[in-house]
């Protein structure tokens, strides 16, 4: 969440940030609640001062032996104190209501985020590798996989519903190899510590990273009371590991990684990417999370981008990097780099990783701090896909397809697959 002090002292900045984001969030209710809170706060402070003055007088009378006057003031203060207690309770409720409204507000944006309505305003900053030129008709990943008998969408839909898939044989082995390859690279070369986190988490955990309360419709949840939520990304449990803790400065920065299945309802994407594995309700992802001191997050953001890029470079998959525009960036992000991999069947780059600096937005929600120079201060949090496994699977099939329908396995991946080619079954 953004700093309530910013809202109280410079709400015009918050309004401008909403305008830049093309956000439909209204500040009207928040302004009304804050106005009511301030009026009541003045009353409460005046009443507290009066109560303190009366308590002082009672003490003076008692000290002077004038018990009668002291008891008289005590009697007069009974109703007054009861009224003050009710006002303080109301003030507490208003403060909670203000904080609940603030939870719906998006993060403030970095000054260098491109201003624009949507993805068309994203700014390309890196392009790596040359898309392969094919001398045969290019197939998409679905046709390739079905021809190789490594994917069964029909049976997956029958046991679940649309946007689910069933990999098998060397298709399943390729998925597993990608997970192991990514984790090994991030842990052995980039300094991340691997975790195996819960994939069902509570509402407070989802609120900490910003999925709740605003994006509940995008989540799958249990019918328990209180409900548990299936994670949409391992960012959620990894970032929450140190929630409500003061992290020793000498432990920072913390580098965390995990492979998990991820679950999203895709409520807002009806009709988009219905064919194949691009947009699934369940998908595999290796996630990267960093927790660092506030003055290090910009530097760590650039390093995390390179960590994610290294996967595609090792697999020799062409990609580009864009800075997301103000109208396309996620709610919790201060600045985001998207890595987009080349898909020959679509003749375009498609997102395969988002790498975001969330500044102190998540840390404030979680009350996650460090102590520096004798003072506690909020840490900064960063997250990035390191990378989306299913979309990497797609990219390998499409970029390494052969004229006979087979798929060559990238050299870097062969120690993890145990085979160098996927061929049509006899």
From Swiss-Prot:
Any one cellular-component term (Gene Ontology): cytoplasm
Q: Where does L-serine bind?
A: 233-235, 287, 385
One Pfam annotation reads tRNA-synt_2b
Q: What is one Gene Ontology biological process annotated in the Swiss-Prot or TrEMBL record?
A: selenocysteine biosynthetic process
Record HAMAP family: Ser_tRNA_synth_type1
PANTHER family assigned to the protein according to its UniProt record, in alphabetical order = SERINE--TRNA LIGASE (PTHR43697:SF1), SERYL-TRNA SYNTHETASE (PTHR43697)
Protein name per its UniProtKB record: Serine--tRNA ligase
């Amino acid at each position: 969440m953004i700093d309530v002090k910013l809202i109280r002292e410079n709400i015009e900045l918050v309004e401008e940030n909403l305008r830049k984001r093309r956000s439909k969030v209204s500040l009207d209710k928040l302004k009304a609640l804050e106005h009511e809170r301030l009026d009541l706060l003045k009353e409460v402070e005046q009443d507290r001062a009066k109560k303190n003055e009366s308590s002082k007088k009672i003490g003076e009378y008692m000290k002077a032996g004038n018990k009668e006057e002291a008891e008289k003031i005590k009697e007069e203060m009974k109703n007054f104190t009861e009224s003050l207690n009710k006002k303080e309770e109301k003030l507490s409720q208003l403060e909670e209501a203000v904080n609940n409204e603030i939870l719906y507000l998006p993060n403030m944006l970095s000054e260098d985020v491109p201003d624009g309505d949507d993805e068309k305003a994203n700014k390309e900053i890196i392009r790596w590798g040359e898309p392969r030129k094919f001398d045969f008709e290019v197939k998409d990943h679905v046709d390739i996989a079905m021809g190789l008998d490594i994917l069964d969408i029909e049976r997956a839909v029958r046991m679940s519903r649309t946007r689910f898939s069933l990999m098998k044989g060397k298709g399943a082995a390729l998925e597993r190899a990608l997970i192991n390859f990514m984790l090994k690279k991030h842990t052995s070369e980039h300094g991340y510590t691997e975790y195996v986190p819960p994939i069902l988490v509570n509402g407070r955990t989802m609120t900490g990273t910003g999925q709740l309360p605003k994006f509940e419709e995008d989540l799958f949840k249990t019918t328990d009371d209180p409900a548990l939520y299936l994670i949409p990304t391992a960012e959620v449990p990894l970032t929450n590991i140190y929630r409500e803790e003061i992290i020793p400065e000498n432990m920072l920065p913390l580098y965390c990684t995990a492979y998990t299945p991820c679950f999203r309802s895709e409520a807002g994407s009806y009709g988009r990417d219905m064919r194949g594995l691009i947009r699934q309700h369940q998908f595999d992802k290796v996630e990267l999370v960093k927790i660092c001191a506030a003055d290090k997050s910009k530097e760590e953001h650039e390093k995390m981008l390179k960590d994610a890029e290294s996967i595609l470079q090792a697999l020799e998959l062409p990609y580009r990097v864009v800075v997301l525009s103000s109208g396309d960036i996620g709610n919790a992000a201060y600045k985001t780099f998207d890595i987009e991999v080349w898909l020959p069947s679509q003749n375009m780059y498609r997102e395969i990783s988002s790498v975001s600096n969330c500044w102190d937005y998540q840390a404030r929600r979680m009350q996650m701090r460090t102590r520096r120079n004798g003072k506690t201060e909020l840490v900064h949090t960063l997250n990035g896909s390191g990378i989306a496994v299913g979309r990497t699977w797609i990219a390998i099939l499409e970029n390494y397809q052969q004229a006979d329908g087979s798929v060559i396995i990238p050299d870097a991946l062969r120690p993890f697959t145990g085979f160098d080619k996927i061929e049509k079954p006899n």
